[in-house]
């Protein structure tokens, strides 16, 4: 299946290169659109799936009218885009508009180094992991700026909570990825996936030797995206909507889009770092060439990556419907007193496992 897709892309690539420098620029723009447009569409369907799944968990139907509810998210988008963006009279006008853009830009920029397959990646950067850490850290500046520019007590309190929470869990996430870097011997995301390849299927994935780091990264990813049960940044019962309390229309839609794009991104990264990315869980167990349409089941391919992402994206919704919101002090305690010490210890354990050959770096 991967070969079929590449056979369609390569002739198009060569045609653009034949146009000279302008063709190179157009090809770069096209690649950006090939990432941005699917992410935006995925967010729309993700919102529908969230409403549907939570409805089932609440013993309700969820969205069910007008195309089984599929078009509800698109209707919400058009509704928000055509609404007026109201600004408080005492707000900082320029910063008020810049803040949602500053939140959205890193959420989309991070996708440039995410590999969907061995050859399907926008930029196969050798410092992809470091680039991701940098991009995912920048989004909080938009939230802080929104809280300050709104000139609202609720917005400012939400922004301060977000700053403390993101900084706290960014450390734990970074330490967890240090373990992945040690196990794979690379900071290139494609090489991290190749390091999990082998003839033992899912037993070669980093999930097993790095299981504590997987749990830390998963929970920290939920906290990093300000989702339940770590959504004190926009806790409705306390500070209404936090940093977004004064936003409406298209500006609010940008915050919403950035949040859900980050949720999908974290789901991709968990799948790549700990679940073998596009690798098949039965890779090496079956050796047969039948048809490109089904060979990916045991050879691996982007459909496996999407299935893993779907599971973790659905887990976000499960968390929201199942767990009560943590208190702010409980969130800080979990990050600083549990996750950070645990990751430091397991980094040392990972180094020992690599030194003694317990973790093999691919085939």
UniProtKB/Swiss-Prot annotation:
It is an enzyme of class 7 (translocase). It is a multi-pass membrane protein. It comes from the Bacteria. Its EC number is 7.1.1.-. InterPro entries: NADH_UbQ_OxRdtase_su1/FPO, NADH_UbQ_OxRdtase_su1_CS. Coiled coil: none annotated. Belongs to the complex I subunit 1 family. NDH-1 is composed of 14 different subunits. Subunits NuoA, H, J, K, L, M, N constitute the membrane sector of the complex. The keyword Signal does not apply. GO terms for biological process: aerobic respiration. The chain crosses the membrane at residues 29-49, 62-82, 96-116, 127-147, 163-183, 202-222, 238-257, 278-298, 299-319, 339-359. It catalyses: a quinone + NADH + 5 H(+)(in) = a quinol + NAD(+) + 4 H(+)(out). Keywords: Cell inner membrane, Cell membrane, Membrane, NAD, Quinone, Translocase, Transmembrane, Transmembrane helix, Ubiquinone. GO terms for cellular component: plasma membrane. GO terms for molecular function: NADH dehydrogenase activity; oxidoreductase activity, acting on NAD(P)H, quinone or similar compound as acceptor; quinone binding. NDH-1 shuttles electrons from NADH, via FMN and iron-sulfur (Fe-S) centers, to quinones in the respiratory chain. The immediate electron acceptor for the enzyme in this species is believed to be ubiquinone. Couples the redox reaction to proton translocation (for every two electrons transferred, four hydrogen ions are translocated across the cytoplasmic membrane), and thus conserves the redox energy in a proton gradient. This subunit may bind ubiquinone. It is found in: Cell inner membrane. This is NADH-quinone oxidoreductase subunit H. It comes from Xanthomonas oryzae pv. oryzae (strain MAFF 311018). PROSITE patterns: COMPLEX1_ND1_2.
């Amino acid at each position: 299946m991967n070969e079929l897709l590449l056979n369609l892309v390569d002739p198009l690539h060569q045609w653009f290169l034949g146009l000279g420098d302008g063709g190179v620029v157009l090809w770069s723009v096209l690649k950006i659109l090939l990432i941005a447009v699917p992410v935006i569409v995925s967010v729309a369907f993700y919102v529908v799936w969230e409403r549907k799944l939570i409805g089932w968990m609440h013993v309700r139907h969820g969205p069910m009218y007008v195309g089984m509810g599929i078009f509800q998210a698109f209707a919400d988008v058009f509704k928000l885009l055509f609404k007026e963006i109201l600004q408080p009279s005492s707000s900082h006008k320029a910063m008020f508009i810049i803040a949602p853009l500053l939140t959205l830009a890193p959420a989309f920029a991070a996708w440039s180094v995410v590999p969907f397959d061995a050859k399907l990646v926008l930029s196969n950067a050798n410092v992809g992991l470091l680039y991701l850490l940098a991009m995912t850290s920048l989004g909080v500046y938009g939230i802080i700026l929104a809280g300050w520019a709104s000139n609202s007590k609720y917005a400012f309190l939400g922004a301060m909570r977000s700053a403390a929470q993101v900084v706290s869990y960014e450390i734990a996430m970074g330490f967890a990825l240090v373990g992945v870097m040690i196990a794979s011997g690379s900071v290139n995301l494609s090489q991290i996936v190749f390091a999990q390849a082998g003839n033992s299927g899912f037993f070669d994935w980093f999930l097993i030797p790095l299981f504590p780091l997987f749990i830390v990264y998963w929970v920290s990813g939920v906290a990093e995206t300000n989702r339940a049960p770590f959504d004190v940044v926009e806790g409705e019962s306390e500070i209404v909507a936090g940093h977004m309390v004064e936003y409406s229309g298209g500006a609010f839609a940008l915050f919403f889009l950035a949040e859900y794009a980050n949720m999908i991104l974290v789901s991709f990264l968990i799948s790549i770092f700990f679940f073998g990315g596009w690798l098949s869980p039965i890779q090496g167990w079956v050796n047969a060439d039948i048809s490109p349409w089904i060979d990916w089941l045991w050879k691996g391919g982007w459909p496996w990556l999407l299935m893993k992402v779907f599971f973790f994206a659905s887990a976000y919704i499960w968390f929201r419907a199942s767990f009560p919101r943590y208190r702010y002090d409980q969130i800080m305690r979990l990050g600083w007193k549990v996750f950070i010490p645990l990751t430091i210890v397991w980094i040392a354990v990972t180094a020992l496992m690599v030194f003694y050959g317990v973790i093999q770096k691919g085939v």
